[in-house]
């Protein structure tokens, strides 16, 4: 969409663009020429990385539920359930892994990054929670770079092997289930 002074029906836009919402992330940026990254994310996504974003992230769950798994300051995993119609503001620098199940849609808004402002994608062992791998990027294309980071991790058995407990994370990610 171009920068125009015109509204549009977001649900219609989602319906017309849902074929673009593909795993592992299932995201599509709405406007390319904005100072914000406003994107629709659909489910099911297939990711297990934790994103450490230098800016706040605003979540609005349009359809179904989204589960945002966060790492607390104490290093514990905590899941925030964002129900249909709910909003959630995730503070900057909180490691988080958004999980979406089938037939769900949400809007996420974050700001574009300043030059030199870096962020991380981090993988933790499913068995012992040890940090296994970290990728630091200057984010310029969220649709492309997140997928590349996930693919790089999933395709490399050496970095999927936990150096702490020996557990090997599977290459293929199952649809996330809230426990």
Curated annotation (Swiss-Prot):
Chain positions recorded as substrate binding sites: 57, 100, 110
Q: Where does this protein act, in terms of pathway?
A: Cofactor biosynthesis; NAD(+) biosynthesis; quinolinate from L-kynurenine: step 3/3
Recorded GO CC terms: cytoplasm
Please state the Enzyme Commission number of this protein: 1.13.11.6
The entry marks the following residues as binding Fe cation 2, namely 125, 128, 162, 165
Q: Which UniProt keywords apply?
A: Dioxygenase, Iron, Metal-binding, Oxidoreductase, Pyridine nucleotide biosynthesis
Under the heading InterPro entries, the entry gives: 3hydroanth_dOase, RmlC-like_jellyroll, RmlC_Cupin_sf
**Gene Ontology biological process terms, A to Z:** anthranilate metabolic process; L-tryptophan catabolic process; NAD biosynthetic process; quinolinate biosynthetic process
Q: How is the cofactor bound?
A: Binds 2 Fe(2+) ions per subunit.
The record's GO molecular-function terms, alphabetically, read: 3-hydroxyanthranilate 3,4-dioxygenase activity; ferrous iron binding
Please name the CDD domains in this protein's record: cupin_HAO
What is the catalytic activity of this protein? Answer: 3-hydroxyanthranilate + O2 = (2Z,4Z)-2-amino-3-carboxymuconate 6-semialdehyde
Q: What class of enzyme is it?
A: oxidoreductase
NCBIfam families the UniProt entry points to: anthran_nbaC, PRK13264.1
User: What family does the Swiss-Prot or TrEMBL record give for this protein?
Assistant: Belongs to the 3-HAO family.
Name of protein: 3-hydroxyanthranilate 3,4-dioxygenase
The scientific name of the source species is Bacillus cereus (strain ATCC 10987 / NRS 248)
């Amino acid at each position: 969409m171009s920068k125009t002074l015109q509204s549009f029906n977001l649900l219609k836009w989602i319906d017309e663009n849902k074929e673009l919402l593909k795993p592992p992330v299932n995201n599509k940026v709405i406007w390319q020429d904005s100072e914000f990254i406003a994107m629709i994310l659909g489910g099911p996504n297939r990711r297990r990385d934790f994103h450490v974003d230098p800016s706040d992230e605003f979540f609005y769950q349009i359809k179904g539920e989204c589960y945002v798994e966060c790492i607390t300051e104490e290093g514990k995993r905590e899941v925030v359930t964002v129900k249909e119609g709910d909003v959630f503001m995730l503070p900057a620098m909180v490691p988080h892994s958004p999980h979406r199940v089938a037939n769900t849609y949400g809007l996420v808004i974050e700001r574009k990054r300043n030059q030199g402002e870096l962020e991380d994608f981090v993988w933790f062992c499913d068995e012992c929670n040890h940090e296994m791998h970290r990728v630091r990027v200057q984010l310029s294309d969220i649709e492309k770079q997140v997928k590349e980071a996930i693919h790089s991790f999933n395709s490399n058995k050496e970095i999927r092997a936990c150096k702490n407990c020996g557990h090997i994370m599977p290459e293929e990610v199952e649809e996330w289930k809230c426990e």
